[in-house]
């Protein structure tokens, strides 16, 4: 059995409430990794050959950086509002200013997905790109960012797992008193491996091995994430405000429509 290593969530105190936190650096790393992977993605088909009416390339690093800015806004705003709405609505209703305390942790993937989808839909319309094409482009670049976020969760000592058999070699006692001082699954690491590394490997191989039909890559991301998050949630401590509903956690219920819609869309686009 292991004990969670102590890492101060604050890397550097600046002045007053201002500080550099590991959680914030995890998000910065996520965006840097996206930028690096997007450079490689430009070499994949059909993006490498697409042209504008004047013969200039449609997909360029300038377009990617513009897209990334819109995506960052969508992820941060959607992720934070999603966490407040899905997991702790009453708390943030009575403490609305705490919605702004993003660096203290508390982001929702499902909220971030909705936020970035809306932001990139608007970006695609404004810049003259096909929405499905945009989502196919970004999908393989996303899981490494999810992996970075889970490392941030681990350092913060949040979102720990359910009680585990103390004889499990990697069972861990988390330092947060709310964790009860008992052996638990390090569910952040499970999610790092499943939603991060495994999903990245699957999507990058699928997207780069040959040209795919429009919508195939994006829908596989929705399906793959839904399945892997659903599985990982089995080991994660249910949210205190939700508990289990019909045996499923809040995260699992949010994954159910992703799995259904993702499978339906992937099957549709694959046969198109």
What positions do the PLM features span?
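Hydrophobic, membrane-interfacing alpha helices
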Residues: 1-272
């Amino acid at each position: 059995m292991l004990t969670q290593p102590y890492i101060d969530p604050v890397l550097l105190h600046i002045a007053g409430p201002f500080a550099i936190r590991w959680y914030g650096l995890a998000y910065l790393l996520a965006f840097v990794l996206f930028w690096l992977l997007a450079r490689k993605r430009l070499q994949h088909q059909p993006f490498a050959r697409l042209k504008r009416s004047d013969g200039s390339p449609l997909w360029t690093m300038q377009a990617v950086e513009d897209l990334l800015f819109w995506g960052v806004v969508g992820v941060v705003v959607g992720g934070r509002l999603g966490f407040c709405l899905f997991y702790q609505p009453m708390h943030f209703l009575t403490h609305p200013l705490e919605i702004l305390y993003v660096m203290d942790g508390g982001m929702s993937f499902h909220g971030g997905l909705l936020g970035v989808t809306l932001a990139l839909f608007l970006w695609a319309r404004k810049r003259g790109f096909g929405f499905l094409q945009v989502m196919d482009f970004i999908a393989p670049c996303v899981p490494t960012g999810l992996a970075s976020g889970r490392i941030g969760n681990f350092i913060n000592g949040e979102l720990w797992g359910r009680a585990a058999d103390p004889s499990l070699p990697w069972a861990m006692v988390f330092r947060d008193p709310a964790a009860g001082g008992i052996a638990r699954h390090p569910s952040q690491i499970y999610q790092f491996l499943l939603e991060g590394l495994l999903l990245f490997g699957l999507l990058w191989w699928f997207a780069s091995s040959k040209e795919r039909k429009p919508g195939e890559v994006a829908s596989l991301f929705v399906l793959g994430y839904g399945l892997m998050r659903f599985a990982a949630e089995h080991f994660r401590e249910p949210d205190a405000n939700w508990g289990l509903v019909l045996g499923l956690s809040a995260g699992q219920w949010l994954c159910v429509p992703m799995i259904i819609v993702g499978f339906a869309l992937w099957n549709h686009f694959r046969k198109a």
